[in-house]
């Protein structure tokens, strides 16, 4: 076999593998996109005739002509907002400590890292059981309130925030911090002024995605007494509440067909909220990238 023939066969083999890989990637992307578009279409088909401002301004009702999702929207925003206020600062500071100040790997940092990785894979319902035993009842006894639900969701998304923040901090070239230290900055100044701003796009994107996950959770909150029918908005951490997934489930399981269409409309509203959060993550990442380049 000549050298030219062997080279030709190797080139053809590489091209075939490259084409097969590109085709499989394209098919996977199109399949995922097609599934998402089909879900959107199904929700729109079943609920487009119901979409109006009344769904946002009215409270849940047993009358399909007077139904709305205001208390569910406000309840979700309260619970997820407070959870984010608790989890994001703690998660980012923990990531900074582990990556920038913990020093060489030791038993303490190894134990912390292992537990963080394990907690990230714990099912949501387990956090609900822990919250029921120690927060809603038990030592804290906060009851079935917004505060209990927010603290449980904060526990649930905290490992994700820490992992994402650590990856973002690792992506910053070490030379950036070394340059700041060489100019006389303290380790904290170099971290705060150089490392953190450059890691912020990744931290912000991952944090918002973690918050988006919390917005769609219902299993842990079922154990914490989240109601499915609430005709008032929460006013504080000690208020009772409902959330969008539970209200949607209530309408979807109703025997009357009208409420099935209302559930589809609620699902579309929830998807719109999640889409807005993801869009915010993209815009925030692009903004911080442009700001860092300037």
Identify the residue ranges that each predicted region occupies.
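Glycine/proline-centered hinge or cleavage motifs at structural transition points of membrane proteins
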Residues: 123, 183-184, 197
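Periplasmic/extracellular loop-to-transmembrane helix junction in inner-membrane transport proteins
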Residues: 4-23, 43-83, 105-106, 250-261
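Transmembrane-helix boundary motif in ABC transporter permease subunits
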Residues: 83-116, 129-132, 137, 282-290
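C-terminal transmembrane helix and the adjacent membrane-cytosol boundary/short C-terminal tail
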Residues: 98, 166, 170, 174, ...
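Interhelical loop and adjacent transmembrane-helix boundary motif
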Residues: 61-63, 67, 221-271
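Transmembrane alpha-helical segments of polytopic membrane transport and secretion proteins
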Residues: 1-29, 281-294
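Generic hydrophobic transmembrane alpha-helix motif, especially the helices
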Residues: 117-157
């Amino acid at each position: 076999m000549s050298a030219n023939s062997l080279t030709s066969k190797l080139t053809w083999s590489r091209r075939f593998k490259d084409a097969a890989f590109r085709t499989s990637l394209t098919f996977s992307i199109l399949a995922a996109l097609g599934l998402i578009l089909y879900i959107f279409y199904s929700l729109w088909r079943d609920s487009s005739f119901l979409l109006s401002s009344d769904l946002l301004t009215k409270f849940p009702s047993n009358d399909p002509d007077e139904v709305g999702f205001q208390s569910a929207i406000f309840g979700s925003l309260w619970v997820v907002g407070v959870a984010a206020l608790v989890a994001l600062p703690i998660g980012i500071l923990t990531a900074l400590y582990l990556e920038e100040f913990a020093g060489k790997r030791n038993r303490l940092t190894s134990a912390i890292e292992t537990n963080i990785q394990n907690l990230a894979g714990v099912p949501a319902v387990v956090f609900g059981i822990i919250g029921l035993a120690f927060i809603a009842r038990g030592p804290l006894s906060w009851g079935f309130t917004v505060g209990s639900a927010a603290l449980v969701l904060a526990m649930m998304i905290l490992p994700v925030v820490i992992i994402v923040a650590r990856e973002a901090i690792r992506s910053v070239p070490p030379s950036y911090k070394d340059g700041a230290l060489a100019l006389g900055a303290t380790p904290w100044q170099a971290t705060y002024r150089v490392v953190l701003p450059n890691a912020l796009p990744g931290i912000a994107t991952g944090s918002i995605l973690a918050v988006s996950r919390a917005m769609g959770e219902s299993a842990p909150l079922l154990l914490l007494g989240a109601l499915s029918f609430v005709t008032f908005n929460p006013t504080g951490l000690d208020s009772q509440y409902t959330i969008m997934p539970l209200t949607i489930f209530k309408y979807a399981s109703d025997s009357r067909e009208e409420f099935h269409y209302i559930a589809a409309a609620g699902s579309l509203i929830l998807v719109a909220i999640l889409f807005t959060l993801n869009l915010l993550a993209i815009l925030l990442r692009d903004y911080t990238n442009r700001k860092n380049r300037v």
